[in-house]
UniProtKB/Swiss-Prot annotation:
One term under GO cellular component: ribosome
Protein name as it appears in the record: Small ribosomal subunit protein uS8
Encoding gene (name): rpsH
InterPro entries tied to this protein: Ribosomal_uS8 (IPR000630), Ribosomal_uS8_CS (IPR047863), Ribosomal_uS8_sf (IPR035987)
Protein family according to the UniProt entry: Belongs to the universal ribosomal protein uS8 family.
Length: 131
């Protein structure tokens, strides 16, 4: 069955895997999902990811990150901009949770965080927030 909102599907798979305490989760491949995964690795929310190509279809295998006590590194991950209600923000992006969390944006500079957007003076579509 085709997925209408691929980013919401990506977020849901990560959230469900974290709650189930799975070490890895597989997500269908897209360039956007790969770029988001690179950003989440750089910011320390996931351990690593690997793009795996098979004869049927490529997918991304994400290695989730947990604390020493077994708590997921991602406490909250929520979609902001949805297909029915797109949310755009100018260059004056506010901090999420006073800087403890991040907004992930799709901008003219690519997939970036709210902090990077403020530094570069660009805005964009707020894809999701993560804490």
């Amino acid at each position: 069955m085709p997925v209408t909102d691929s980013i919401a599907d990506y977020i849901t798979r990560i959230r469900n895997a974290g709650r189930a305490k799975n070490k890895t989760t597989d997500i269908p491949y897209s360039k956007l999902r790969e770029n988001i995964s690179e950003l989440l690795v750089a910011k320390g929310y996931i351990k690593s990811f690997t793009v795996i190509t098979t004869e049927q279809f490529p997918f991304i295998r994400i290695d989730l990150k947990y604390s020493a006590l077994g708590e997921p590194a991602i406490r909250e991950i929520t979609r902001v901009s949805k297909p029915g209600r797109r949310v755009y923000q100018g260059k004056d992006i506010r901090k999420y949770l006073g800087g403890l969390g991040l907004y992930i944006l799709s901008s003219s500079k690519g997939i970036i965080t709210d902090k990077e957007a403020r530094e570069q003076g660009v805005g964009g579509e707020i894809l999701f927030r993560i804490y």
